[in-house]
């Protein structure tokens, strides 16, 4: 590499020390935030490569600047691998984030002010699915659908009825905190019944879809978006897929020159590396283990009457737990667990009664611990440590026991092998 670690440390000790502290934190913490993962050294090498120097507005073979022959090869590799993974005819690998991907998808499908249906944030949706504080809620007339108040599952009869009443131009499916299988074919049936387009945001489950462990939305959605991190285990970024050539042209124009300038070709290269990793048979084993570990943790909570798992369990990489019988709110739980080096996030639950800054629940994800090598036994242990912490929040001796147990686990499963 052009600039090695010793040069970096000597040139900017303050920044070096901050990065070193973050590396230490990640090594010594159990990471359960469902949107986080652990990338390979190859992904980091690509993202830190000399490609960061190159400006390349446009698309392969159609650039505004010269000297782009090499980055054309890089971006084409990423595109072709993404298409192969998801069985899509067209892929745009340039979005800087999942939110950018969603923005471009909306621009390709609807006009400002159009009516759109998206999943309610408290029910498991995402900010970009119509939250009032998001560009999506401010640009389009979003109306939220929720889950059944009893089962906490998607109620397709209710969604159909709502769609027939409000006649949306677009229905958005996908979630950031829904632990069950999503039937995308039913969403397409509803969209067709009311003359709407269907967009799916599969950011959280993309790795499971890639491994064939969750039904794919690509055959049903007019446009599918995703992040490239989370369960895909790639760099932070976005990806857009479609099987419609005309929509592909609109997507490309929406990304550039619509909402972005030059693509981050070093990140595109990192996406290409991670896509190659996804195509390796070992990735399917990883994804299967993610689900096993998620279920193993959920089962521990299901056996404790002081906790309630939203929708009764999990079929993917995450689940939500109502913690209000044990601690005041999700924020309190998050902070308590931070103190014992277990990292997760507070999370609203369906029909939430507390503010989003407090919440009734926490969200637990298995992607990152699985990437480190945790199995079902270790995952059950993690769940037990969470319960032990929350039930003994004022007992420093018990909390110290938890910290020691966390250290044993993180030492046994290093973030990266030397």
UniProtKB/Swiss-Prot annotation:
The modification N6-(pyridoxal phosphate)lysine is found at residue 230. Keywords: Amino-acid biosynthesis, Cytoplasm, One-carbon metabolism, Pyridoxal phosphate, Transferase. The keyword Cell cycle does not apply. Disulfide bonds: none annotated. GO terms for biological process: glycine biosynthetic process from serine; tetrahydrofolate interconversion; tetrahydrofolate metabolic process. (6S)-5,6,7,8-tetrahydrofolate binds at residues 121, 125-127, 246, 355-357. It is an enzyme of class 2 (transferase). GO terms for cellular component: cytoplasm; cytosol. Gene3D superfamilies: Aspartate Aminotransferase, domain 1, Type I PLP-dependent aspartate aminotransferase-like (Major domain). NCBIfam families: PRK00011.1. HAMAP family: SHMT. This is Serine hydroxymethyltransferase.
């Amino acid at each position: 590499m052009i600039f090695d670690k010793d040069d970096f440390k000597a040139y900017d000790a303050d920044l070096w020390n901050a990065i070193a502290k973050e590396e230490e934190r990640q090594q010594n913490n159990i990471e359960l935030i469902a949107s986080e993962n652990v990338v390979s050294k190859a992904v980091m090498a690509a993202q830190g490569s000399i490609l960061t120097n190159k400006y390349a507005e446009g698309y392969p073979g159609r650039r505004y600047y010269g000297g782009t022959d090499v980055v054309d090869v890089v971006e084409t590799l990423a595109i072709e691998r993404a298409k192969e993974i998801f069985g899509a005819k067209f892929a745009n690998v340039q979005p800087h984030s999942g939110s950018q991907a969603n923005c471009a998808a909306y621009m390709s499908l609807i006009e400002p002010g159009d009516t759109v249906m998206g999943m309610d944030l408290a029910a498991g949706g995402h900010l970009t699915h119509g939250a009032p504080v998001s560009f999506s809620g401010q640009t389009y007339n979003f109306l939220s659908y929720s889950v059944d108040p009893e089962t906490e599952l998607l109620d397709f009869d209710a969604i159909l009825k709502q769609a027939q009443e409000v006649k949306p131009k677009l229905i958005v499916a996908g979630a950031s905190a829904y632990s069950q299988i999503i039937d995308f074919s039913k969403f397409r049936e509803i969209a067709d019944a009311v003359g709407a387009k269907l967009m799916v945001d599969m950011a959280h489950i993309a790795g499971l879809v890639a491994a064939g462990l969750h039904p794919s939305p690509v055959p049903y959605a007019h446009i599918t978006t995703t992040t490239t991190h989370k369960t895909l285990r790639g760099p932070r970024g976005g990806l857009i897929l479609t099987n419609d050539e005309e929509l592909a042209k609109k997507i490309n124009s929406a990304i550039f020159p619509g909402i972005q300038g030059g693509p981050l070709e070093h990140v595109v290269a990192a996406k290409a590396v991670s896509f190659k990793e996804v195509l390796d048979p070992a990735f399917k084993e990883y994804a299967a283990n993610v689900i096993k570990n998620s279920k193993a943790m959920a089962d521990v909570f299901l056996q404790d009457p002081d906790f309630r798992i939203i929708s009764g369990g999990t079929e993917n990489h995450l689940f939500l737990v109502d913690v209000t019988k044990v601690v005041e709110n999700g924020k309190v739980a998050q902070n308590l667990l931070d103190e014992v080096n277990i990292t997760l996030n507070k999370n609203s639950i369906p029909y939430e009664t507390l503010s989003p800054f407090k919440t009734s629940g926490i969200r637990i994800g298995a992607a990152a611990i699985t990437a480190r090598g945790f199995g079902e036994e270790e995952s059950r242990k993690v769940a037990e440590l969470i319960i032990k912490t929350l039930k003994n929040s004022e007992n420093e001796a018990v909390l110290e026991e938890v910290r020691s147990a966390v250290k044993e686990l993180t030492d046994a499963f290093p973030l990266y092998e030397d």
